[in-house]
Amino acid sequence: MERPFGCFFILLLISYTVVATFDDEPSFPENADLTKDLEQKCFSINKVDPNLKFENDRLKRAYIALQAWKKAIYSDPFKTTANWVGSDVCSYNGVYCAPALDDDSLTVVAGVDLNHADIAGHLPPELGLMTDLALFHINSNRFCGIIPKSLSKLALMYEFDVSNNRFVGQFPEVSLSWPSLKFLDLRYNEFEGSLPSEIFDKDLDAIFLNNNRFESVIPGTIGKSKASVVTFANNKFSGCIPKSIGNMKNLNEIVFTGNNLTGCFPNEIGLLNNVTVFDASKNGFVGSLPSTLSGLASVEQLDLSHNKLTGFVVDKFCKLPNLDSFKFSYNFFNGEAESCVPGRNNGKQFDDTNNCLQNRPSQKPAKQCLPVVSRPVDCSKDKCSGGSNGGSSPSPNPPRTSEPKPSKPEPVMPKPSDSSKPETPKTPEQPSPKPQPPKHESPKPEEPENKHELPKQKESPKPQPSKPEDSPKPEQPKPEESPKPEQPQIPEPTKPVSPPNEAQGPTPDDPYDASPVKNRRSPPPPKVEDTRVPPPQPPMPSPSPPSPIYSPPPPVHSPPPPVYSSPPPPHVYSPPPPVASPPPPSPPPPVHSPPPPPVFSPPPPVFSPPPPSPVYSPPPPSHSPPPPVYSPPPPTFSPPPTHNTNQPPMGAPTPTQAPTPSSETTQVPTPSSESDQSQILSPVQAPTPVQSSTPSSEPTQVPTPSSSESYQAPNLSPVQAPTPVQAPTTSSETSQVPTPSSESNQSPSQAPTPILEPVHAPTPNSKPVQSPTPSSEPVSSPEQSEEVEAPEPTPVNPSSVPSSSPSTDTSIPPPENNDDDDDGDFVLPPHIGFQYASPPPPMFQGY
């Protein structure tokens, strides 16, 4: 047996060696440039049979290139390359020879045409050896990979067509090195990246780029192009149509369809008097049609459909001398000349469907048209049409103040004492329902006088739309006056807040949404933030309560948030604030206060500011006293009690949170948290005002932070303190709010856990907090105190709580407990039974 096996093994080795010898392929790097060294290597690797005779050396080089290419072909169903054998390369299928341009006595390979051969393979670097190649057509095959750099040697290239294949990578810049190139067709591949501006500096007659993955703006050098046909269709080009387009005197056809282009049409389009096809459909163009459009004297096909164009389609556009087809459907035109009505134009094809035209069939519903038609884009101020403002980018959405991702904002745990200024991170009160409530002043309940020196809210800081950026760092407000949450009021996301749901998005009705091209709601953008508000719905639990929650607490909390900053979860909560959004009825309160105390704590103080802005201001005062408690936030929860006492100032707002439960409540919002993210902006929703306080996101950080962090870190105590803050202004409101909070606490059975001992800390300050008027009652607002107790369920939920972040209650609940807190240890009796579902479940009539 051994001998037969040994013989078999030897035979196997011999056969393998023979196959390898015949199958030896050039070892050229795939994308190598064809330097002289590599050329020499190519000749040595691709040894030519000495028996083959060639008319000249150029045909020999072509033979080497074509044989290397044949080896790079994996599938040839039509046997197109089957006869690529022997030295007569001019007889190969798809290969064309002609006299050399520099020496007509020499025959060279001048062209390759393998169109529609369904060949699969790639392009080897050896193709660079065919230096006399002027025509290269391989469209409608299955070639893949990249266009090798070695093709830069093809200096005579005149037509390069690789369309309808599977090429990838960046724009093939080798094409920029061909001085004689006139026809460039890259259609239907997978090229990506930006379009080099140099492409329009070349003397090209046709540029086909459609159906790839290019994503960039259209270079302004397009005006230098002498091309007669240019197609950008079905890519991801964005921005404006360059105004230099008016300089393209040779242009006959230009196609922009299926991109993300925006803004108004530049007036220079009217200078294209030789254009026969102008297609700008399926983009995001806005505004009215420029009057210069009547300058398209040669246009035969004009397609502006599926955009967001408005205004009146005038008679002169529909009576262009050579016009055969004019499509302006799926826009927001609200008027058209009689000559533009389909069927009344002597056989011309007009399409006006899905607009806002009266007495015409198949139009958009009125509620979808109204938002767009009532606020048309002023193209005189649009950068795309020459204005200075830049309307092209559809009005920038109100800065999203990055929903102040509270969590990350690492609240700069402001040293409780110092931070007196609750420079709540300027959380954009995006949702801040009606952040305007600069009324914060109300929050600035002087009550903060609470000995804890509720963080001076610097008189409810006028919600300055503080830049959300800061939101993270809530510089702890000085306990003085209920934290004057300088909420960065993102104010006027406020709108969205009040009707969180409505706020969400542009309103389904928003024409933009309706219009196929939803991409760019140029005008509506601002609403975008609103959109977030809607998400709060989850938090909706007990929407009414939210309003109370919103009360000032948020500001106060801002300081505590720092403590929480550590726990990212709070950020999550930020969304909960949206929950508060439900309260829209009393939008103001919900917005501000809720966000801060609950979840937001993590966001750190940032949110707190927003709370103030909300109308809640009054409630805040009552809570503000609690702030003292909050001050503790910086300290770890374990110390909270003590800290609270010391840091009360910061905590002032904390009092509200003191009911840590609220923080837990926030957890309840957890559901809201899910929606939170979307909702963050709209704290309005019941879910704890936390989010509502536009700063919602920020509030989230602030209010809850303490609690949430408490879970994460002992710092809970600070959290509690924040609760008081909420009481800030109107103790009465606060008390109301508390009720919600308590309810919320109940619903969020989780609450129990949240509060951790730290909550107690608020107690010391609780009175101050409560008293927005000194009287702690407001602060405690019996219900809230209950809430606090529920939180007692200590840390267990903590982790979860942070996620809930909503804890709308937090802000408000503190009041009652605050009274208890005054004792210093009001370990919230764990209402384990209750789920802190959207904290603000407590629903006050009218909210």
Swiss-Prot record:
Glycans are attached at residues 260, 274. InterPro entries: Leu-rich_rpt, LRR_dom_sf, LRR_extensin-like_regulator, LRR_N_plant-typ. Disulfide bonds: none annotated. Modulates cell morphogenesis by regulating cell wall formation and assembly, and/or growth polarization. Residues 1-20 form the signal peptide. GO terms for cellular component: extracellular region. It holds the Pfam family LRR_1. This is Pollen-specific leucine-rich repeat extensin-like protein 2. LRR repeats lie at residues 45-71, 106-130, 131-153, 155-178, 179-202, 204-224, 226-248, 249-273, 296-319, 321-343. It comes from Arabidopsis thaliana.
